[in-house]
Amino acid sequence: METIKIKSPGTVANLVCGFDILGLALNEPADGMELSLLDKPEVIIYNRDDYNLPTDPVKNVAGVVLLSIMEKTGGNIGFSLTIEKHIKPGSGIGSSAASAAGAAVAANHLLGNIFSNDELVQFAMNGEKLASGVKHADNIAPCIYGGVTLVRSIHPLDIVSIPAPDMFVTVVHPQIEVRTADARQILKQQVLLK
């Protein structure tokens, strides 16, 4: 059984005026993930943390990503995923993106890197849709590409890596939980400029 262990980084998105388009990857925190290839079409998920996230693959952001990859490859393979979350869900630093992107990148590696980064973003956006109700890539793109990214479009997908100097980032967190889906419901659909 082939297995890979990865770390999937937290991210900060909605940088300055870049709502849903600008994001950057952080060195820490990062989720630990171990993914194994199975010879039968199923997804098994184990959690090694206290967040009680769903282990049913259709209700888990990483599980949805793995299912979409299985569908694209013909469904003759499966995955066993163990997640150790170090990014608290609802923390605002890309917890769902780390799970979704990490699953996509790890699966791609086990499959011989058959998908491009853009395709991995597309798979991972399925996880974000489960988490927030909307496919968006502002956290997914930096998680997969690294560094700072600009999502110019998701239809068609157009992502630009932005060169950035080495820098230190300080994240001040009020330790409250706000789920992305809830935060999106508060936002107005249109913002007037006057």
Regions found by a protein language model. Give the residues of each.
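ATP-binding N-lobe of GHMP and related small-molecule kinases
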Residues: M1-S91, V105, H109-F115, G146
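Generic structural signal for well-ordered, non-membrane alpha-helical segments
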Residues: L15, T55-A62, A97-A100, N117, ...
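Short, glycine/charged-enriched secondary-structure capping and boundary segments
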Residues: D20-L22, A97, Q185-L187
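Short, conserved acidic/polar surface loops in the N-terminal third of protein domains
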Residues: S91-S95, S153-I154
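Short glycine/threonine-rich catalytic loop with a Thr-x-Gly-x-Asp
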Residues: I93-A98, L193-K194
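Patatin-like phospholipase
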Residues: A98-G127
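ATP-dependent small-molecule kinase catalytic core of the GHMP/sugar-kinase superfamily
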Residues: S116-K194
